[in-house]
């Protein structure tokens, strides 16, 4: 643990930091109001991400016991290296492209030739009819979601999400003074609870966010589910005389198993915006590169496209990283070795089932969502630490009673963890 002094509003404040966190501000001082940060930021500081905190706990345990004796399933950080074409593309571009072009500004939407290459790839794969103007290159999917929410959301309008969900969605919606509305989980299948959705959509609903393949459950929404969802949204648009956007967050699209197909949502509902990231499909999470798709069929699409490009700029991104845009152009149809994740998926799923744990077999992404053997899943997570097993509580995804395990780890980590999971299961009367 390192420490440093920060000057905040004329005061010197001691801040502790690790490699993974830039600082932990004293909570007593924060509550007392002596640190002058925005009111909107105080809840984020007070409730720092459980996932990140668990990752830091993993660092502590690794330092104490050794990396091979710690089973850290907390963070969805890809463990499979990027395809060779990524390295080759970077070398080729740096050696052969004009530097002022390669590293320079471009249209806020991104290089036109890059966007056209991606559009044609999507058209080949999904039978769509996109062109360059339908795409906006973004600083990953997270930035893309902020861009589209900035573009469409007015203060106090509602955005609906299906629990369990990535909790940062709430932060993104509140960035633009919107209101997040949760739909309770369908814990039998973890397909969206469409009955409750239909009840909660109202005249103030601006958008619905979906994520498939799904974090944290690994479920892929079926075509039947997507068709039913689209029908509900169409009906509600007509009922309220307003546009309801469907925002599809797709960082895990390429990670699907057992031949499962992931429906491409613009084909089912015209007012769909797709947010994509190469963080998982090419193992490039730190490079922050992705895109938005805004189809021509979307209501007033040309205005939305123009506004989204401007939002990309005014939110501070200006444009997506220029070098990585060109890398993506050269690697547009490449993907990571999904077979490695599949091997991990089967080993961990089968191993946990043999220990007596309950969970749905994931169809995509790289997560298992396991039912806690006790009502308070945080108690279960704490018990896991005794065996150097790190899991994320389901309450971090607005779904208490479950824990998430990210199996984007080494195969040896999974194999070595299973005897410890067996001990953990025995502690709770399983097996």
Regions of interest found by a model, annotated:
Residues 101-102:
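Pre-Walker A segment
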Residues 57:
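Short beta-strand-loop-alpha-helix junction that forms the active-site gateway
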Residues 98:
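Alpha-helical substrate-binding/gating segment
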């Amino acid at each position: 643990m390192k420490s440093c002094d920060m000057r905040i509003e004329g005061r010197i404040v001691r801040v502790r930091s690790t490699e993974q966190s830039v600082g932990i501000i004293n909570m007593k001082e924060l509550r007392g109001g002596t640190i002058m940060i925005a009111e909107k930021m105080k809840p984020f500081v007070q409730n720092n991400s459980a996932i990140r905190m668990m990752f830091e706990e993993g660092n502590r345990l690794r330092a104490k016991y050794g990396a091979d004796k710690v089973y850290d399933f907390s963070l969805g950080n890809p463990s499979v290296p990027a395809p060779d074409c990524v390295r080759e593309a970077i070398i080729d571009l740096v050696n052969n492209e004009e530097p002022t072009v390669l590293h320079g500004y471009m249209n806020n939407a991104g290089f036109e030739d890059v966007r056209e290459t991606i559009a044609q790839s999507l058209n080949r794969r999904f039978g769509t009819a996109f062109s360059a103007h339908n795409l906006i290159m973004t600083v990953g999917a997270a930035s893309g979601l902020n861009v589209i929410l900035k573009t469409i959301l007015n203060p106090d309008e509602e955005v609906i999400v299906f629990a369990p969900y990535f909790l940062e969605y709430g932060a993104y919606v509140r960035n633009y003074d919107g209101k997040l509305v949760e739909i309770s989980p369908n814990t039998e299948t973890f397909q969206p609870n469409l009955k409750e959705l239909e009840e909660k959509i109202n005249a103030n609903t601006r958008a619905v966010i979906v994520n498939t393949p799904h974090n944290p459950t690994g479920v892929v929404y079926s075509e039947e589910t997507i068709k039913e969802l689209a029908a509900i949204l169409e009906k509600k648009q007509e009922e309220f005389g307003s546009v309801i956007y469907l925002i599809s967050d797709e960082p895990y699209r390429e990670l699907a198993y057992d031949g499962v197909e992931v429906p491409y949502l613009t084909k089912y509902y015209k007012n769909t915006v797709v947010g994509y990231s190469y963080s998982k499909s090419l193992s490039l999470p730190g490079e922050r590169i992705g895109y938005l798709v805004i189809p021509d069929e979307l209501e007033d699409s040309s205005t939305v496209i123009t506004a989204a490009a401007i939002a990309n700029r005014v939110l501070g991104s200006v444009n997506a990283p220029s070098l990585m845009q060109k890398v993506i152009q050269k690697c547009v149809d490449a993907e990571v070795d999904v077979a490695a994740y599949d091997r991990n998926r089967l080993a961990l799923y089968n191993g946990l089932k043999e220990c007596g744990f309950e969970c749905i077999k994931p169809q995509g992404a790289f997560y298992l969502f396991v039912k806690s053997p006790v009502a308070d899943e945080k108690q279960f997570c704490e018990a896991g630490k005794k065996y150097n097993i790190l899991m994320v509580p389901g309450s971090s995804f607005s779904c208490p009673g479950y824990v998430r395990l990210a199996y984007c780890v080494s195969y040896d980590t999974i194999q070595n963890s299973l005897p410890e999971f067996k001990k953990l299961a025995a502690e709770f009367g399983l097996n």
